[in-house]
Amino acid sequence: MREETREQPAPLRSGLTTGSCATATSLAAAKLLLTGQRDDAVDITLPKGKVVQMRLEFCRLIGECAEAGTLKDAGDDPDVTHGALLYSQVRLLAEPGIGFVAGSGVGTVTRPGLVLAVGEPAINPVPRRMISEHLQRLADACGYLGGFEVTVNVQGGEQLALKTMNPRLGILGGLSILGTSGIVRPFSCAAYIASIHQGIDVAHTNGYTHIAACTGNASEDTMRRVYGLPEIALIEMGDFVGAVLKHLRKVPVPRLTLCGGFGKISKLAAGHMDLHSRHSSIDLPQLAGWAADIGADEALQAAISGANTSQQALALAHAAGIALGDAVCAHALAFARSVVPAQVHVEVFAIDRQGGIVGQAGVQ
């Protein structure tokens, strides 16, 4: 009998950023105005020189303007904007230059601390440059000496933005037009880490001296309850504690609180910078060793080492009067202090699934 061979998974498919979509739709609309040519697809050049073709959903004249739209294709990345209609409207200006406007579903910057000034449409620098370069090349080819006004829109963008970090960063009214390479890499962490850095920058620039980096909603709720911190001072770090700690070398906020579930804090205590289960695991024998340091007998150490979960290990220690939660937080604190500058005061909280505090260290 022939042995069956396991089917190999297909490679994940990359997509294109909102910045690439805005570039393609702006180019198509401007081309219609300057040449009368109505395209079904356009070629754009990405920042590293790769040329890609993007299909258009429409390209049409509306009075003195033209608009073109495309569907955002994020490939196999679980991007909140995947499948959204992004469209740009272009108007010709008498004077040279390119102006950008936040249309429907695109946000506006309302707080200092980001790369864009307050009041600017949330169209990031690389997409602006991509759009400007493509429109300037078109203008040169057509002998056009005037300028362009580009309004970028995302259908449903105001609702989609509520699923992003934009409201917390002070980007209101819609999404940001993003991208540095023009390409969306499936399951890339770059965008999430960038939002963590932006959150710290915005809090710091707006004068907040105490921020809390939290692994999830329960830990954020705990920090609101304990310290009454506003949204701007709460950093949703998820599993990327390393992104927080390393960024504080550049932006040394005076006081940092780290808060997360006991299992994740135990990973931090063991020196892990990425707390996701793909990249780090809970070391139960290490927990047993820390319990031994604060008085656990051999039987309890064995029980902790053989526990099914970190929560069970914590419960076993608690029943024996061993403050394992505090011990784990103390080790997490020591590791965090080894990464951040000395002037940053760090404290650590561990919580259970209900948001109850099961350990703390360094608390003022």
Swiss-Prot record:
Pathway: Cofactor biosynthesis; adenosylcobalamin biosynthesis; cob(II)yrinate a,c-diamide from sirohydrochlorin (anaerobic route): step 6/10. Its EC number is 2.1.1.195. One of its GO terms (molecular function) is cobalt-precorrin-5B C1-methyltransferase activity. Gene3D superfamilies: CbiD-like. Coiled coil: none annotated. The keyword Ribosomal protein does not apply. It catalyses: Co-precorrin-5B + S-adenosyl-L-methionine = Co-precorrin-6A + S-adenosyl-L-homocysteine. Keywords: Cobalamin biosynthesis, Methyltransferase, S-adenosyl-L-methionine, Transferase. It comes from the Bacteria. The keyword Iron-sulfur does not apply. One of its GO terms (biological process) is methylation. Belongs to the CbiD family. This is Cobalt-precorrin-5B C(1)-methyltransferase. It comes from Pseudomonas putida (strain ATCC 700007 / DSM 6899 / JCM 31910 / BCRC 17059 / LMG 24140 / F1).
